[in-house]
Regions:
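Peripheral, non-catalytic segments flanking oxidoreductase cores
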Residues: 1-142
Length: 142
């Protein structure tokens, strides 16, 4: 069974250590504060709105393989070249090297919300790494 760890639980560090020394994997809950969770929910709604745009609009922001950024149509990607194409569409973005021509302009605030989602994810990553740092007694300052 995969451990589910509430990061707001005062014993979360012990639960993480137990999970990763026994199972090697865990699912974290309550990882974000209320504001960040609300902001991420808004971003998920924004992404849903992007994928609901007409295909011709989404095609204005094509995936660029050399940068791994942009919009990929259904059946355009697959990790395993011997397998059928993935039946999904995606929009890959980045906060540091995303060219302006790949940011959709049809949705107000799309770029700002995308950048905010990266900031939230970065802070969450540091929070979780700091927890592992404390468990392992590395003494780092993240």
């Amino acid at each position: 069974m995969i451990p589910v760890i509430d990061l707001k639980n005062p014993y979360a560090l012990q639960h993480i250590e137990d999970a990763y020394t026994s199972v090697g994997f865990a699912v974290f809950t309550n990882a974000l504060d209320t504001k960040d969770q609300t902001d991420m929910n808004c971003w998920f709604d924004e992404m849903k709105s992007f994928f609901e745009l007409d295909q011709e609009i989404k095609n204005k922001y094509p995936y660029e393989g050399d940068t791994n950024l942009g919009y990929s149509i259904v059946g355009d990607e697959n990790v395993d070249p011997t397998a059928p194409k993935d039946m999904k569409e995606s929009f890959n973005y980045n906060n540091q090297r995303m060219p302006d021509h790949l940011w959709p302009t049809e949705l107000n605030g799309f770029k700002a919300n995308a950048l905010q989602s990266v900031d939230i994810a970065d802070r969450l990553t540091l929070k979780i790494l700091s927890m592992f740092d404390e468990i392992l007694k590395c003494g780092s300052t993240l």
